[in-house]
Swiss-Prot record:
<comment type="subunit">
    <text>Component of the EKC/KEOPS complex composed of at least BUD32, CGI121, GON7, KAE1 and PCC1; the whole complex dimerizes.</text>
</comment>
<keyword id="KW-0804">Transcription</keyword>
<feature type="binding site">
    <location>
        <position position="151"/>
    </location>
    <ligand>
        <name>a divalent metal cation</name>
    </ligand>
</feature>
<dbReference type="GO" id="GO:0002949">
    <property type="term" value="P:tRNA threonylcarbamoyladenosine modification"/>
</dbReference>
<comment type="function">
    <text>Component of the EKC/KEOPS complex that is required for the formation of a threonylcarbamoyl group on adenosine at position 37 (t(6)A37) in tRNAs that read codons beginning with adenine. The complex is probably involved in the transfer of the threonylcarbamoyl moiety of threonylcarbamoyl-AMP (TC-AMP) to the N6 group of A37. KAE1 likely plays a direct catalytic role in this reaction, but requires other protein(s) of the complex to fulfill this activity. The EKC/KEOPS complex also promotes both telomere uncapping and telomere elongation.</text>
</comment>
<feature type="binding site">
    <location>
        <position position="325"/>
    </location>
    <ligand>
        <name>a divalent metal cation</name>
    </ligand>
</feature>
<keyword id="KW-0963">Cytoplasm</keyword>
<dbReference type="GO" id="GO:0000408">
    <property type="term" value="C:EKC/KEOPS complex"/>
</dbReference>
<keyword id="KW-0539">Nucleus</keyword>
<dbReference type="InterPro" id="IPR017860">
    <property type="entry name" value="Peptidase_M22_CS"/>
</dbReference>
<dbReference type="InterPro" id="IPR043129">
    <property type="entry name" value="ATPase_NBD"/>
</dbReference>
<keyword id="KW-0010">Activator</keyword>
<dbReference type="InterPro" id="IPR000905">
    <property type="entry name" value="Gcp-like_dom"/>
</dbReference>
<dbReference type="GO" id="GO:0000785">
    <property type="term" value="C:chromatin"/>
</dbReference>
<dbReference type="GO" id="GO:0045944">
    <property type="term" value="P:positive regulation of transcription by RNA polymerase II"/>
</dbReference>
<dbReference type="Pfam" id="PF00814">
    <property type="entry name" value="TsaD"/>
</dbReference>
<feature type="binding site">
    <location>
        <position position="183"/>
    </location>
    <ligand>
        <name>substrate</name>
    </ligand>
</feature>
Length: 366
């Protein structure tokens, strides 16, 4: 096994992470400290504060409105993160921000605030890839060594394996992301956006009794989700469909919103399990790490766990404080890069809406 090029810190290091690529605004402070016994570096989450922009049922979130929310809340969220961590801005060794991918205007809010704080307090800046942040926080929390990563969120669906200091994308969505698919269907059937559309679909799917037929779109290690979204939406116009207020126990041959939530989950998650298993077979991996907001879904974890156990492996996942977009994952990835000497001059801190996971040089791993 190759030795990591990342040296143990000689003193405690602190990083502030700012995340705002979509409707979650998060700020967190993390510390990396030398172990008194000479063991692995001690990593401690000092604060992890988040504020979510929530729209009315049936509505998504527009970039301009989301950016307005972030501008309104970013100072309050940073102040709370600093207060909870019990540190001062001058104590920070670096400020990390989400460089991309994500929605342009919300990303710019986080980058602008990071630049301002950097200039005010003379603190180095580190731009972080959003997906790499998810992966590094997932690895840290779960202590998983070298798993296949399934990254599932509102804007991304990727199957990833690490090789030669890159997170290589083995498969991905060919059209829309799984989180986008779930969110859009939730809007069609009138589910609330609080706490999230995907969570509400998961809750209602547990009451589903009927698995309706939906297209199954896998190709190699890629998936296509636009067709399945169109098909499940079409069921809401079927004469057998009954909306929430029309569902009763008398009629038998009906299709309910519960059935459609159940069917959409079962079919799309089966597709995700299939492409993940294919990637595992390709690289000889046994373990899976699920990251991203959809990774909180317990049914997805259960289905993936069945597959992994049959292969003699395990599934790793985190709770909602870490799988949903947050600032601490940006702080973690940023501090790893900082420890390798990777910082950004001010003129290089522009945001990149389409920032590929495999574009990042993962210098801190062997």
């Amino acid at each position: 096994m190759k030795q990591s090029p990342l040296h143990r810190p000689s003193r405690p290091l602190l990083a502030l992470g700012i995340e705002g690529s979509a409707n979650k605004l998060g700020c967190g402070i993390i510390s990396h400290s030398p172990s008194p016994t000479g063991g692995p570096t001690l990593v401690m989450v000092l604060s992890n504060v988040r504020h979510t922009y929530i729209t009315p049922p049936g509505e998504g979130f527009l970039p301009s409105d989301t950016a307005r929310h972030h501008r309104e809340w970013v100072v309050k969220v940073i102040e709370e993160a600093v207060r909870k961590a019990g540190v001062r801005m001058g104590d920070l060794d670096c400020i990390a921000f989400t460089k991309g991918p994500g929605m342009g205007t919300p990303l710019q809010v986080g980058a602008l605030v990071a630049r301002t704080l950097s200039l005010l307090h003379n603190i180095p800046l580190v731009g972080v890839n959003h997906c790499v942040g998810h992966i590094e926080m997932g690895r840290q929390i779960t202590s998983s060594h070298n798993p296949i990563v399934l990254y599932v969120s509102g804007g991304n669906t990727q199957v990833i394996a690490y090789s030669q200091q890159r997170y290589r994308i083995f498969g991905e969505t060919l059209d829309i992301a799984i989180g986008n698919c779930l969110d859009r269907f939730a809007r069609v059937i009138g589910l609330r956006n609080d706490p999230s559309p995907g969570y509400n679909i998961e809750k209602e799917a547990k009451k589903g009794k009927r698995l309706v037929q939906l297209p199954y779109g896998t190709k190699g290690m890629d998936v296509s989700l636009a067709g399945i979204l169109h098909s499940v939406e079409a069921y809401t116009k079927d004469k057998r469909y009954r909306s929430w207020d029309q569902v009763n126990d008398v009629e038998e041959d009906i299709i309910t919103p519960y059935d459609l939530c159940f069917s959409l989950q079962e079919t799309t998650f089966a597709m995700l399990v299939e492409i993940t298993e294919r990637a595992m077979a390709h690289v000889g991996a046994k373990d899976v790490l699920i990251v991203g907001g959809v990774g909180c879904n317990l049914r997805l974890q259960e289905m993936m766990g069945i597959m992994a156990s049959e292969r003699g492996g395990r599934v790793f996942a985190t709770d909602e404080s870490f799988c949903i977009d947050n600032g601490i994952m940006i702080a973690q990835a940023g501090l790893l890069a900082f420890r390798m000497g990777n910082t950004m001059p001010l003129e290089k801190t522009g945001v990149t809406q389409r920032y590929r996971t495999d574009a990042v040089h993962v210098a801190w791993r062997a």
